[in-house]
């Protein structure tokens, strides 16, 4: 019995899950085939005088009716006829419409000369956030209107909208086909919407801001402006509703995408299943096809039609669902479109060549070469079932993939003449992953050119599990050996595994995708960033004598990480810019994690060896080893311990955590494990005594535990964290317990028999002060990273006195939002009578609604002379001075 037969029988017995995947994949593939049939006149560039639609009767038949509605065509419909999706056009031309450095006046000057519906995304200096500037028709009065873009944790949305998206591109693409809170849908510039290939889009993108004043920004002679919906409830006029009623029964009617702006809450939504992101091509060798039925035409002839699309399967919930979006939502599949010839008969779509897949990375090419023997499984079996047909859906025509480019060879984009015919017109709006569900808003296409790579099918499960801390990154120029195996998985099994791994990949957050993208960029020596990182890593590994001490080496690495992070935040090598994918208050966090993976991961082994050599050379480890043995022989009371200590089992648990810490390269993750150890020690102390303990009691217990673990490597681990941890994390619990661990080790190093290990020596205290000053005073400019996300606010009432609460306040939350939080926390009945005040230097200053309390707090902390200040929530009429603080950059001491 062959291996393939055994695998197939195994799937029959245990593969009900795979069978379900096959069924859903087949239905979605057929759905997409039906959805992408465009009008012949549209493909020829002609504007139809009237629109035909297929109306389903209650007896199951279809008839053709004229649609008298004339709505303005949205950008999505134009993109279908031009073989490129809206998302593709937005991604390739973002240097044109994404102008974050543009001021309000410059944006208004650009849009004044544009037709209604054209837009720009820039950053407003007044609102301190990104805005969508939209050109309005004359009947609206004002020529422009700005819509603020709200940035939450890794999502983007318009102010007032309940729909969130993973990045700006999907947000703009959605509003090109649905208006939601906008007065009408967005429109792409004429040159962008009519471009036929990616090469043309890239040529336009090279103009950047000059595109708006160039001849390329040409408009058609009679471009109709976008219209508002004719009714507020989002339903088309009564004449159109009558077409949907046959014998008093509602019928299912297919609609063109241009009608989507007339159907808001009751209209068709775009559906995407993250399991399947590619349109399944038809089997040219006579595979299974959906049975077609014949319906009598109006003139008595029969015409072939496909059955109506089946309802889509339920959407997969995201792992990180926004609370306001975690509600039940109904998703309707996009209606199918049918081609008509001039005689009114339905024209069957012609078979078009299947597109050749783009060049893949080397590791993918080797993986696909190994599949060569299994590619002809379905081709050699005329009666192959649907499973085998799905197995070859991803490999069009059995054509081999193109050769992968070299390390520094960039394949030029194919021209429109040499590009093979693709299914650009067949790419439905659902391919943009647009939906009102949070799972779709957080989902990225794996084949999307956003990050310039395709996910490796061999390591999809590893990508889902996140970053691997227990291995060091391989050198960037290391050939991957092909694994030889006596058993080759059949194409069927590989296809199923790829689909399942695609689900795991779709669950990755934008943060992890960006970190992985930056890590790939750091290994690309064709980029300046890649050369910078690789040259520095090679220099450190080859020149071990360039540092005089362990502290000097770690400080140099930290300084390089900070400089590279600053370069990357301003560089154009991240295309598209990181601001369009990650909210501003999370950019530094994402870049810091990327630096850990790009720099610290390949240097982990080298840094560990160098730290060990330094401490062995200066004799500190020898002294530490002797003192550890001496401390272990003492009773806890002799060490100044008067609280319960962990038993042998708890000490072993702590030792396992310390050993796990050694395998990690990220200082942030090391600190998280250290916090778990400290929490475990505190739990043992409190549970065994029934009372709370402070820091004076905790330090001797921590010293005792470290001595019992007997690990010399803890010395280098703590030094590693203290020098490489991001300074913004030194102000919280991580920095506090990190200094506690350093103090415990200092007590062991300086342990004397006649002295209890309870108090730190003056030398250790001075060392900690110098370390804290060195790590924190270099950040002179106040930043959103210099403070915690908490704000202490006092509530003052005439009768009840003053009380206070600690509120969770993000850096970009305004005073108006803080007042709303205070009104809820303090249970104020008339919040309009209250406001937030700043009390500093014996003066009261009422904060304006558009100021940022956390930025004010950071600026006060960064001053050379410390100021005592308080945020007070109190009645406005009790303000004796009536001083309004308008700007966070003004002098806080002037009244």
From Swiss-Prot:
- The record lists its disulfide bonds as none
- Using the record's annotations, give every residue carrying the modification Phosphothreonine: 509
Residues of the Ras-associating domain: 787-878
User: Quick one: where's region Disordered?
Assistant: 284-361, 373-442, 460-481
**Comp. bias regions, Pro residues:** 306-315
Annotated ranges, domain VPS9 = 618-757
| SH2 domain location | 97-190
In alphabetical order, the GO MF annotations are: GTPase activator activity; GTPase regulator activity; guanyl-nucleotide exchange factor activity; small GTPase binding
| Organs and tissues of expression | Widely expressed. Expressed in heart, kidney, lung placenta. Expressed at low level in skeletal muscle, spleen and peripheral blood.
GO biological process, alphabetically ordered: endocytosis; positive regulation of endothelial cell migration; positive regulation of endothelial cell-matrix adhesion via fibronectin; positive regulation of vasculogenesis; small GTPase-mediated signal transduction
Q: Where in the cell is it found?
A: Cytoplasm
Polar residues bias: where?
328-338
Organism superkingdom: Eukaryota
Any single GO CC term annotated in Swiss-Prot or TrEMBL for this entry: cytosol
| InterPro entries per record | RA_dom, RIN2_SH2, SH2, SH2_dom_sf, Ubiquitin-like_domsf, VPS9, Vps9-like, VPS9_dom_sf
Recorded hits in Gene3D superfamilies, A to Z, give: SH2 domain, VPS9 domain
Q: Name the UniProt key words of this record, in alphabetical order.
A: Cytoplasm, Endocytosis, GTPase activation, Phosphoprotein, SH2 domain
Q: At which residues is Phosphoserine found?
A: 366, 501
Listed Low complexity bias regions: 430-441
Q: What's this chain's function?
A: Ras effector protein. May function as an upstream activator and/or downstream effector for RAB5B in endocytic pathway. May function as a guanine nucleotide exchange (GEF) of RAB5B, required for activating the RAB5 proteins by exchanging bound GDP for free GTP.
User: Family assignment?
Assistant: Belongs to the RIN (Ras interaction/interference) family.
Subunit: Homotetramer; probably composed of anti-parallel linkage of two parallel dimers. Interacts with Ras. Interacts with RAB5B, with a much higher affinity for GTP-bound activated RAB5B. Does not interact with other members of the Rab family.
Q: Which disease is it linked to?
A: MACS syndrome: A complex disorder of elastic tissue characterized by sagging skin and occasionally by life-threatening visceral complications.
Name the chain's protein.
Ras and Rab interactor 2
């Amino acid at each position: 019995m062959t291996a393939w037969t055994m695998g197939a029988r195994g799937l029959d017995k245990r593969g009900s899950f795979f069978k379900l995947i096959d069924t859903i994949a087949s239905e979605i593939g057929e759905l997409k085939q039906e959805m992408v049939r465009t009008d012949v006149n549209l493909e020829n560039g002609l504007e139809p005088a009237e629109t035909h639609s297929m109306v389903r009767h209650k007896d199951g038949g279809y008839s053709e009716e004229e649609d008298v509605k004339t709505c303005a065509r949205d950008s999505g419909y134009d993109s279908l006829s031009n073989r490129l999706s809206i998302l593709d056009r937005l991604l390739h031309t973002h240097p044109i419409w994404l102008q974050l450095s543009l001021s309000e006046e410059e944006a208004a000057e650009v849009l004044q000369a544009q037709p209604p519906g054209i837009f720009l995304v820039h950053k407003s200096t007044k609102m301190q956030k990104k805005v969508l500037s939209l050109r309005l028709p004359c009947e609206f009065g004002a020529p422009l209107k700005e819509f603020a873009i709200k940035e939450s944790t890794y999502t983007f949305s318009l102010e007032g909208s309940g729909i969130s998206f993973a990045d700006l591109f999907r947000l703009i693409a959605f509003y090109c086909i649905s208006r939601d809170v906008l007065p009408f849908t967005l429109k792409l510039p004429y040159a962008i919407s009519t471009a036929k290939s990616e090469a043309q889009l890239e040529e336009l993108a090279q103009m950047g801001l000059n595109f708006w004043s160039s001849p390329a920004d040409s408009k058609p002679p009679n471009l109709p402006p976008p219209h508002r919906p004719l009714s507020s409830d989002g339903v088309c006029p009564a004449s159109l509703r009558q077409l949907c009623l046959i014998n008093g029964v509602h019928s299912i009617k297919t609609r063109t995408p241009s009608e989507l702006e007339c159907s808001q809450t009751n209209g068709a939504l775009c559906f995407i299943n993250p399991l399947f992101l590619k349109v399944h091509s038809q089997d040219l060798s006579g595979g299974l096809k959906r049975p077609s039925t014949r319906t009598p035409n109006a003139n008595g002839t029969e015409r072939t039609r496909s059955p109506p699309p089946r309802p889509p399967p339920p959407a997969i919930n995201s792992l990180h669902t926004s609370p306001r979006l975690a509600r039940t939502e109904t998703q309707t599949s996009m209606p199918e479109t049918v081609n008509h010839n001039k005689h009114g008969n339905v024209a069957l779509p012609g078979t078009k060549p299947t597109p050749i897949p783009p060049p893949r990375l080397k590791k993918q090419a080797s993986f696909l070469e190994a599949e060569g023997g299994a590619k002809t499984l379905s081709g050699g079996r005329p009666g192959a079932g649907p499973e085998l047909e799905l197995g070859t859906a991803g490999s069009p025509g059995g054509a081999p993939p193109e050769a992968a480019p070299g390390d520094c060879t960039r394949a030029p984009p194919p021209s429109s003449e040499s590009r093979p015919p693709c299914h650009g017109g067949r790419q439905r709006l659902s391919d943009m992953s647009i939906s009102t569900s949070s799972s779709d808003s957080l989902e990225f296409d794996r084949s999307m050119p956003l990050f310039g790579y395709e996910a490796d099918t061999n390591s999809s499960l590893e990508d889902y599990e996140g970053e691997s801390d227990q291995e060091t990154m391989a050198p960037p120029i290391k050939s991957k050996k092909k694994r030889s195996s006596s058993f080759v998985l059949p194409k069927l099994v590989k296809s199923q595994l790829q689909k399942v791994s695609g689900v795991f990949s779709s669950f990755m957050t934008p943060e992890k995708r960006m970190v992985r993208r930056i890590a790939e960029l750091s290994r690309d020596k064709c980029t300046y960033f890649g050369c910078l990182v690789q040259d520095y890593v090679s220099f450190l590994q080859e020149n071990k004598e360039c540092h005089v001490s362990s502290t000097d080496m770690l400080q140099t690495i930290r300084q390089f990480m900070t400089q590279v992070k600053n370069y990357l935040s301003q560089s154009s090598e991240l295309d598209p810019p990181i601001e369009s994918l990650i909210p501003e208050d999370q950019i530094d966090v994402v870049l810091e994690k990327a630096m850990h993976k790009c720099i610290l991961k390949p240097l982990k082994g080298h840094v560990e060896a160098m730290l060990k050599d330094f401490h062995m050379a200066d004799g500190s480890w020898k002294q530490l080893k002797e003192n550890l043995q001496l401390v272990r022989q003492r009773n806890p009371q002799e060490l100044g311990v008067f609280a319960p200590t962990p038993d042998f089992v708890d000490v072993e648990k702590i030792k396992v955590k310390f050993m796990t810490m050694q395998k990690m390269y990220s200082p942030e993750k090391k600190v998280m494990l250290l916090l778990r150890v400290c929490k475990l020690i505190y739990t043992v102390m409190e549970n065994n005594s029934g009372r709370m303990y402070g820091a004076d009691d905790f330090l001797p217990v921590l010293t005792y535990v470290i001595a019992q673990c007997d690990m010399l490597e803890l010395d280098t681990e703590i030094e590693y964290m203290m020098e490489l941890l991001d300074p913004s994390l030194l102000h919280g619990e991580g920095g506090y317990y990190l200094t506690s661990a350093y103090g415990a080790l200092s007590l062991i190093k300086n342990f004397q028999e006649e002295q209890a290990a309870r108090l730190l020596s003056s030398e250790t205290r001075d060392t900690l002060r110098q370390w804290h000053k060195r790590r924190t005073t270099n950040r002179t400019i106040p930043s959103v990273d210099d403070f915690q996300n908490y704000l202490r606010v006092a509530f003052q009432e005439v009768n009840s006195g003053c009380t206070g609460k600690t509120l969770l306040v993000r850096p970009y939350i305004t005073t108006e939002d803080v007042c709303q939080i205070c009104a809820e926390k303090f249970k104020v009945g008339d919040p309009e009578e209250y406001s937030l005040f700043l009390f500093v230097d014996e003066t009261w200053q009422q904060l304006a609604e558009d100021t940022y309390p956390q930025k004010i707090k950071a600026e006060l902390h960064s001053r050379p002379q410390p100021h005592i200040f308080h945020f007070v929530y109190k009645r406005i009429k009790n303000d004796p001075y009536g001083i309004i603080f308008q700007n966070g950059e003004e002098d806080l001491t002037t009244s």
